[in-house]
């Protein structure tokens, strides 16, 4: 059953399993054999093999037409990407692969490759030292600002000048003295209301 016939589609005797040989335009991959297996039990298996290694993706469809998330991979990232983009289906309505399953397959592959922990530790130490320097700089700037803050007398002078300006502006505009709460002569005539 592992032999691929040169014919495009072939039926195996006594079963509903189909195998296909897919054409590959890329000579760099040393012409790997790609096979698709499908049976009446609504399961789908796809494999790529060459002399350098073996790569497989297995998807199975449950009875309520939801694809299960069982995907197995032993591929490099280029093989995984090739499988995800070239995965053929004999019946598109019965066998659909979701973007979530493809991204899960790719994510799992990248996790297996991983980055060495020594590289991560070096970057973390650099990032921590930069963060500490920024924090120290902010504290120094904050202390300088607090040292330069005005005294209470300076604050009182500033706000009393602002209050006098607003009183004068309101008096001129509305002819009303808000300090003494009395109307003044001018363009508005004030009438007192008694509740």
From Swiss-Prot:
Its main location: nucleus. Gene3D superfamilies: p27 (4.10.365.10). Ubiquitinated by SCF(FBL17). Ubiquitination leads to its subsequent degradation, thus controlling cell cycle progression. Disulfide bonds: none annotated. Expressed in flowers, in developing pollen, and at lower levels in roots and leaves. Residues 1-11 have a biased composition (Basic and acidic residues). GO terms for cellular component: male germ cell nucleus; nucleoplasm. GO terms for biological process: negative regulation of cyclin-dependent protein serine/threonine kinase activity. One of its GO terms (molecular function) is cyclin-dependent protein serine/threonine kinase inhibitor activity. Residues 1-50, 61-80, 117-154 are annotated as: Disordered. Keywords: Cell cycle, Nucleus, Phosphoprotein, Protein kinase inhibitor, Ubl conjugation. InterPro entries: CDI_dom, CDI_dom_sf, KRP. The keyword Nucleus applies. Pfam families: CDI. The modification Phosphothreonine is found at residue 151. It comes from the Eukaryota. It is found in: Nucleus, Nucleoplasm. The keyword Cell cycle applies. Residues 37-50, 68-80 have a biased composition (Low complexity). Specifically interacts with CDKA-1, but not with CDKB1-1. Interacts with CYCD4-1. Binds to FBL17. Belongs to the CDI family. ICK/KRP subfamily. Binds and inhibits CYCD2-1/CDKA-1 complex kinase activity. May target specifically CDKA-1. This is Cyclin-dependent kinase inhibitor 7. It comes from Arabidopsis thaliana.
